[in-house]
A protein has these predicted regions:
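SAM-dependent Rossmann-like transferase core, predominantly class I methyltransferases
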Residues: 5-86, 246, 260-279, 284-290
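Mobile active-site "lid"/loop adjacent to the S-adenosyl-L-methionine
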Residues: 139-176
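C-terminal catalytic and target-recognition region of SAM-dependent MTase-like enzymes
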Residues: 205, 210-291
């Protein structure tokens, strides 16, 4: 059941979406249901986001109540609010979009009735200080595929339907992940965990290889695959749907080159893999010989 949320009374910085799209509800198990604003400038929670939330519900119980959580790229705030609902006392959330932060705060009041989450407008870790902001668990469910080819970008420039389109909203996920992985160890307490959801179209092997190259001299990095889901490729805007042919060709090229993974169902739809990993970073000790 949808709830009616008055956006303008909750925040003067948010323009109200059409009345028929005011809100939507998601259920994650253990009685945890959240009602979220459906605002055109903030990503609606995807099937992958729902799977990520369901994992959090199963993974983090009362023993984590006093742990410090950081949710990077919070979007609607769904995972931060879910953690608070599950009893986590200290939750910080960042997003590069000021509209997302405004909507997340509205969602917080609608679902929790109080401002308990520390929301910060920030590009990844930019708004945080590693000397004061160290966390037991960091969450990241990054959007985006890998960097598009030069041929794709040239074709896109010749396509009228691509005018005004934000390419960064869908592509360059590998660059975002590189920036994220470059800094994340600085914000993890000893023994802390990183929970991250990766899209197989981002090029997971290359991303993990770059992570090891960056940090293996200073950290022992361990990871495990917590769960994997398969979802059909969804193009959420009319502009992206008009570019479906170009996008499919690009994804097929990535897959043929071994730079990404997808498969096709009987209808010819692209099916991608969503993979949730848990990572730990243990600082290497240095003996007298520097080994």
């Amino acid at each position: 059941m949808s709830a009616q949320v008055n956006l303008q009374s909750a925040s003067p910085n948010i323009d109200s979406p059409p009345a028929e799209d005011v809100s939507y509800s998601l259920y994650f198990g253990l009685g945890q249901c959240l009602t979220l604003v459906d605002h055109p400038e903030v990503f609606k929670v995807s099937a992958a986001g729902k799977a990520f939330g369901s994992l959090l519900t199963r993974r983090f119980g009362r023993q984590y109540a006093d742990a410090r959580f950081l949710d990077i790229g919070t979007g609607s705030g769904v995972h931060s609010l879910l953690l608070r609902r599950l009893g986590m006392k200290s939750v910080t959330a960042t997003d590069i979009s000021p509209q997302a932060i405004d909507v997340a705060r509205i969602n917080e009041v609608a679902n929790l009735g109080a401002g308990d989450v520390r929301f910060i407008h920030s590009d990844l870790f930019d708004g945080l200080d590693p000397t004061n902001d160290a966390f037991d668990v960091i969450l990241f469910n990054p959007p985006g595929w890998q960097t598009p080819s030069a041929a794709f970008l040239q074709a896109l420039q010749r396509t009228e339907s691509a005018q005004g389109l934000s390419i960064e909203a869908m592509f360059y996920g590998d660059r975002t992940l590189k920036r994220f992985f470059d800094e994340v160890p600085l914000f993890l307490k000893p023994g802390a965990k990183l929970i991250i959801g990766l899209n197989s179209l981002v090029g997971i092997p290359a991303v993990m290889h770059a992570l090891c190259q960056k940090h293996e001299a200073d950290y022992h990095i361990d990871w495990c695959l917590l769960e994997r889901h398969e979802f059909p490729l969804m193009l959420y805007t009319q502009q992206w749907r008009q570019l479906q042919g170009l996008i499919h060709e690009e994804i097929v090229d990535w897959t043929r080159q071994g730079a990404a993974y997808c498969r096709f169902n009987e209808q010819g739809d692209i099916i991608w893999s969503y993979e949730i990993l848990e990572l730990t970073f243990s600082r290497r000790s240095i003996d007298g010989n520097g080994q």
